Amino acid sequence: MLPEAVAAMTKLLSEPGNPSSLHASGRRARRAVEESRERVARAVGCGSAEVVFTAGGTEANNIAVKGIAWDQRSKDPRRIRVVAGSTEHHAVLDPVRWLGESEGFEVTWIKSDNEGRITPDALREALGDDPTDVGLVSVILANNEVGTINDIAALTAVTREFGIRFHTDAVQAPAWLDLNFSELGVCAMSISGHKVGGPHGIGALIISRDCHVTPLIHGGGQERDVRSGTLDAPAIVGFATALEISAERRAETVARVGALRDDLVTRVMQIAPEAIFTGAKKDRLANNAHFVFPGCLGDSLLMLLDAQGVECSVGSACNAGVPQPSHVRLAMGADDDAARSTLRFSLGSTTSQSDIDKLIEVLPSAIERAKRAGVPKLTTAPVRA
């Protein structure tokens, strides 16, 4: 967390109060919440009334995907289809699947290109000749695995022709991109605190005033009757503080971290020429470096590097202890083995040159050992969008 966010949050933790209460401590907490709401709104280019606080990006995505789909179907029974990108984060992927499996919706996945990008032409293909049955389109703004940035404004220009609601998962974006909700053309956008140096367990769903959402949680309706539950005022203040500071420092951070990322990519390719740098080359998050290391299981590399003090990620989940291929890489056209041989290095505002040097020092031996271990055959079918 950013030190400023820790300080702001700690101060309010010592002054407890329920923002929904009318007594003095409640009014003090409510003032902190509403001031934070205004700060969040300024940082992402929306009105303060459009900010609905949630318990994080996953809840925000679930509220948007399920709530908008339900609302649109209730108003027009023809709208029984949900269209989403094949490279979505599981916080969108899984709710969309659930709507299809449990709620009777039809699901269409938008094809990705080989850089992880969702294009307007691919969206038109997914919508089909008669998109009057589509209640919602959801496409991630910046991919969490490979860092590719989608042109959301170009995509909403397509859905606007048919009056289709559009949601975007923008959780990865605020620290690295100039985000303006009013210019994207979406009706809902999800963001999260811990991605900007704020606390875990807090986020927001930005919802346009004309967008109606059927709530998931009932019991108080504290947030526009969209989300119920006592608000976590300290976390909200920490979130707003971090978001505000990250926006103020964005240009400098992007330039510095982007240079470190480019150095990392160049040096990795020098010591491992067989490695493949994946994702978009230009329209990409400045902090993201994603590779395929042929012949190496991504999970093996992760553990070997972790033992040397280097923390990184793979784009896979483990099912019963069996590493699964990255659904993002599969959607980009990779085969099963390549999709299990991925590794993502995510840089942050505190990443230094010495961190890059450390990685380059220990990576060759990790690759050598991972190659000796090999890539075991899958024993279960890979999960695809």
Regions inferred by a protein language model and the residue ranges of each:
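Pyridoxal 5′-phosphate
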Residues: 1-385
